[in-house]
From Swiss-Prot:
NCBIfam families the record matches: NOT-MenG, PRK09372.1
Positions bound to substrate: G78, D79, V80, I81, R100
GO process terms (BP): regulation of RNA metabolic process
Signal peptide: none
Binding partners and assembly: Homotrimer.
CC cofactor: a divalent metal cation
SUPFAM superfamilies named in the record: RraA-like
Protein name (Swiss-Prot/TrEMBL): Putative 4-hydroxy-4-methyl-2-oxoglutarate aldolase
Pfam families in alphabetical order: RraA-like
Organism of derivation: Mycobacterium leprae (strain TN)
Segments passing through the bilayer: none
Length: 157
């Protein structure tokens, strides 16, 4: 499902006090600063094999929300995984953790938000969970709901 982008500030103004706006401050890394789409989720800790497996599947503009437990010890996404996501039709990634290859990520036409960077690779064992509710910054990200992200923040509707 392709979702038309709407600025998060406009969504907040139209929804009002019931808005689900993420309080966690993410940094922009991808080449696309505005993105929106249906939510898919992964929960993994310092292991990106499951994340890569999910992004290997085609998506019609989905956004993968990755709960990496806020770890900045290893990167969950780098240029290879970001290119894979872009080539398979994903609109964006929201990573509660670290990324790497920051300069290269800016050149990939996909939205990527993360907490920070670390050049250290993650493990590739495949541990984690998929299709689970993920709680970040006071917001519950539910698979199938729609997330909007831009320079002002992240809103779930």
């Amino acid at each position: 499902m392709i979702v038309s982008f709407r600025p998060t500030a406009d969504l907040v103004d139209s929804i009002g006090v019931d808005v689900r706006s993420c309080d966690l401050q993410f940094r922009q890394f991808g080449g696309c600063s505005e993105f929106a789409g249906p939510i898919s989720t992964v929960r993994c800790f310092q292991d990106n094999a499951l994340l890569k497996s999910v992004l290997s599947q085609t998506s019609a503009g989905g956004v993968l929300v990755v709960d990496g437990a806020g770890s900045l010890h290893t990167a969950l996404v780098g240029d290879v995984i970001a290119e894979l996501a872009h080539s398979n039709g994903w609109a964006g990634l929201i990573v509660n953790g670290a990324v790497r290859d920051a300069a290269a990520l800016r050149g990939i036409d996909i939205g990527i938000k993360a907490l920070g960077t670390n050049p250290r690779k993650s493990t590739k064992i495949g541990t984690g969970e998929r299709h689970v509710e993920v709680n970040l910054g006071g917001v519950t990200f539910v698979p199938g709901e729609v997330v909007y992200s831009d320079d002002d923040g992240i809103v779930v509707v």
